[in-house]
Swiss-Prot record:
InterPro entries: Ald_DH/histidinol_DH (IPR016161), Ald_DH_C (IPR016163), Ald_DH_N (IPR016162), Aldehyde_DH_dom (IPR015590), G-glutamylP_reductase_CS (IPR020593), Glu-5-SA_DH (IPR012134), GPR_dom (IPR000965). The lineage of its organism: Bacteria, Pseudomonadati, Pseudomonadota, Gammaproteobacteria, Pasteurellales. The gene is proA. It catalyses: L-glutamate 5-semialdehyde + phosphate + NADP(+) = L-glutamyl 5-phosphate + NADPH + H(+). Disulfide bonds: none annotated. PROSITE patterns: PROA. Keywords: Amino-acid biosynthesis, Cytoplasm, NADP, Oxidoreductase, Proline biosynthesis. This is Gamma-glutamyl phosphate reductase.
């Protein structure tokens, strides 16, 4: 099954790589129109997933991620149109020049080829990833979670029908709809056809892909993000940054998970923070000095464990650690961080520069919320994932991250001397 799927995707990628921007945009426009026109059918299939989720007693938060409404579906169609408006990176000349030999050489952006994406309970990802891959001339094989099997199946049908209307191969976008996990393992070994694997989910999914894939894997998405409040920080402004970083949308990978506070201001600052967040239902996890201060401030607090310091909560839980100085803060981040997003709140330019230079992360912030680590916020237009690794792409992965490049060399029957 997957061998055939891989071959079809590879053949489709060959055709996609030759398309003009206008041809790709036309296909995306038809996809957006079909999402709107087929909304009743899509929502009916999504309702089946929701009913099964309730029968299986999935959490309210997970069911909410699964749910498609007329408004959300319209938002997905609008997102596809937004991708149309983005600049096409394929064919862009990165750099080049003429060598002493007279050979003209240019480095030109090209599609990667075939992308494999494994993700969990978010049907919107099906369209997000498909549209970004199509814009960059890549074919894609999608494998969503079993919780979205009905939604994904109908969404793929809509996309494939739209591709055929545009005169393009429908196998440019395919999905593994069988929930058998063995098929995931087979996809990870399909290196003859698939050029990159992008997992979108929790740490277990990323570890599975890293351990078993024979295809390059984009590692990321798991964010144990820290914010360090240094003693010179404007405390009132710092509280609003922390509020935003923790409570705006707790389930995201760029949410603050561990707050580091300098010892010299902890007794003054933490009670202010607790008071400000009192209506937000934040549960604190702390030890030693931080635990005592938070208890006295009347916070909902329990003792933090070593495992929790490495945990991406994805909720309104917040670890709080009191540290002696910036050196201790950076050391804590080195030990527990996931190289996603780290922030310092300070009035010292020297300490800010030290933090930037010494903290190893995809995004490092000075006096700002970690919530900005996002393709749209970074001006990339859209993202397929957030990478925390260092090879190929790092941070929010926009359209350019779905491309490679080739060296194009032109001569006048030029030979090497």
């Amino acid at each position: 099954m997957l061998e055939q799927m891989g071959k079809q995707a590879k053949d489709a990628a060959f055709i996609l790589a030759q398309l003009t921007t206008a041809e790709k945009n036309r296909a995306l426009s038809i996809i957006a129109e079909q999402l709107e026109q087929q909304a009743p059918l899509i929502l009916a299939e999504n309702a089946k997933d929701i009913e099964l989720a309730k029968q299986n007693e999935l959490s309210d938060a997970l069911i909410d991620r699964l749910l498609l409404t007329q408004e959300r579906l319209q938002g997905i169609a609008n997102d596809v149109r937004h991708v149309i408006s983005l600049a096409d990176p394929v064919g862009k000349i990165i750099d080049g020049g003429t060598l002493d030999s007279g050979l003209k050489i240019e480095r030109v952006r090209t599609p990667l080829g075939v992308i494999g994406t494994i993700y969990e309970a978010r049907p919107n990802v099906t369209i997000d990833v498909a549209s970004l891959c199509l814009k960059t001339g890549n074919a894609v094989i999608l494998r969503g979670g079993k919780e979205t099997q009905f939604s994904n199946k109908i969404l793929i049908e809509v996309v494939q029908n739209a591709l055929e209307q545009a005169g393009l191969p429908k196998f440019a976008v395919q999905a593994i709809t069988d929930p058998n996990r063995e098929l995931v393992m087979q996809l990870l070994k399909l290196d003859r056809y698939v050029d990159m694997i992008i997992p979108r989910g929790g740490s277990d999914l990323h570890e599975l892909c890293k351990q078993h894939s024979t295809i390059p894997v984009i590692v990321g998405g798991v964010g144990v993000c820290h914010t360090f409040v240094e003693e010179s920080a404007d405390q009132n402004k710092a509280i609003f940054v922390i509020d935003n970083a923790k409570t705006q949308r707790p389930s995201t990978c760029n949410t603050l998970e561990t707050l580091l506070v300098q010892h010299s201001i902890a007794e003054e600052f933490l009670p202010k923070l607790v008071s400000h967040l009192s209506a937000k239902n934040v549960k604190y996890h702390a030890k030693s000095t931080a635990l005592n201060i938070l208890k006295q401030a009347g916070a909902n607090v329990c003792e933090v464990t070593e495992k929790e310091l490495r945990k991406e909560w994805g909720s309104l839980d917040l670890n709080v650690v009191v540290v002696e100085d910036i050196h201790a803060a950076i050391e804590h981040i080195r030990q527990y961080g996931t190289q996603h997003s780290e922030s310092i709140l300070t009035s010292s330019q020297n300490l800010a520069r030290q933090f930037i230079n010494q903290v190893d992360a995809a995004a490092v912030y000075v006096n700002a919320s970690t919530r900005f680590t996002d393709g749209g916020q970074f001006g990339l237009g859209a993202e397929v994932a957030v990478s925390t690794q260092k090879l190929h792409a790092r941070g929010p992965m926009g359209l350019e991250a779905l491309t490679s490049y080739k060296w194009v060399c032109e001569g006048e029957y030029t030979v090497r001397k």
